[in-house]
Amino acid sequence: MTEAPVHRGTRLSRGARRTQLLAAAREVFAAHGYHAAGMDGIAERAGVSKPVLYQHFPGKLELYRALLTASADELVDRVRSAIDSSTDNRERSRAAVAAYFDFVAGEGQAYRLVFESDLRGEPEAAAVVQSALTRCLDAIAAAVTTDAGLDPPRARLLAVGLVGLSQLGAQYWLDADRMVPRDEAVDLMARLAWGGLAGFPRIHDADQ
């Protein structure tokens, strides 16, 4: 369910206006893609004039980059919070899977900008997406390294597997009209992930 556009003339602080413009842009970009979206449509969706939009963003590319960065940072924050949510590896692996499902199912379809961008060939946009992936892998690999005692290359490979499983599973679940309830879908994917991770005993347990 989308929010109704703010009527023209509504006075907002600069920060609130920027947030409003980004929300409107996310809806337009998610619905039409970068190339088909226009500043006219974004301004109309936000309920502002084009000059107001250009006061905050000099062009469509800059607006897209700002939105992509915010969406990518949201994903990274979700994954980091999941890893930090528990010291139990099984709970952490489920939380990491759930982080991707919640990001994909979130309002505004921000995930489409990160995972399905039609601007992947633009260097700065590609760098933002790669940075988000790297930071997610860093968080998961660090936990695997600490708990399983694996060296960084092997821990990172496991992290890539968990990220791929979570991301693709969540996207398929959404594209398939959520064929099973969200919690059940998360449990299924988490059980698959844990079936692999459980094969690596915690180094702290091995030392006892």
Where are these regions (language model features)?
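N-terminal intrinsically disordered/low-complexity leader segments
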Residues: M1-A16, P201-Q208
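Helix-turn-helix
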Residues: Q20, A24, V28-E62, A66
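Alpha-helical DNA-contacting segments of helix-turn-helix folds
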Residues: A37, R65-S71, V129-A132
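Hydrophobic alpha-helical connector segments
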Residues: A66, R80-Q109, L158-L162, V186
